[in-house]
Amino acid sequence: MSKINFLPTLQDAYEPLMAAQIDILREQVVAEGGDKASVQSRFNYAWGLIKSESVDDQRLGVKILTDIYKESYQRRRECLYYLTVGCYKLKEYSMAKRYVDTLHEAEPNNKQVIALKEMVEDKIQTETIKGLAMVTGAIVGIASIAGYYMRRRK
């Protein structure tokens, strides 16, 4: 049986908490000593920040989770999942892939991990195709302009 099968979906990350809810999570962390607060309080706050619509909040959430990952061996798998979601939301797809690949190695049969991995890989593929289309379009545009000027010179 998989160790983590109770995780939120990627779509959950796009349902922001109300400002008052984030304030409560922040106040809990501050009351417990900020960086010295319990792992659970900081984790909850980080997830609340990742769910935020503010990119700065999302980045702070990812940073907090990264710190938790480094210091709490017991929470590493969970952190990897949430870090994947956070990086995906920040459009840092290569980092998201790195995290989800590491998690997938540890839990190759976890359906939530597999689904998240597929979403990350699909997004990377889509972004790659968009990038290639833009480069191709730029080349065609430049070639057209060059051809136009070459014809005018004659």
From Swiss-Prot:
GO cellular component, one term: mitochondrial outer membrane
SUPFAM superfamilies with a match to the protein in the record: TPR-like
TM annotation in the entry: 131-150
Major location (coarse): mitochondrion
Disulfide bonds: none
Listed InterPro entries: Fis1 (IPR016543), Fis1_cytosol (IPR033745), Fis1_TPR_C (IPR028061), Fis1_TPR_N (IPR028058), TPR-like_helical_dom_sf (IPR011990)
Subcellular localization(s) per the UniProt record: Mitochondrion outer membrane
Membrane topology term: Single-pass membrane protein
Functional note: Has a role in mitochondrial fission. Has a role in outer membrane fission but not matrix separation.
Name assigned to this protein: Mitochondrial fission 1 protein
Organism, scientific name: Candida glabrata (strain ATCC 2001 / BCRC 20586 / JCM 3761 / NBRC 0622 / NRRL Y-65 / CBS 138)
The encoding gene: FIS1
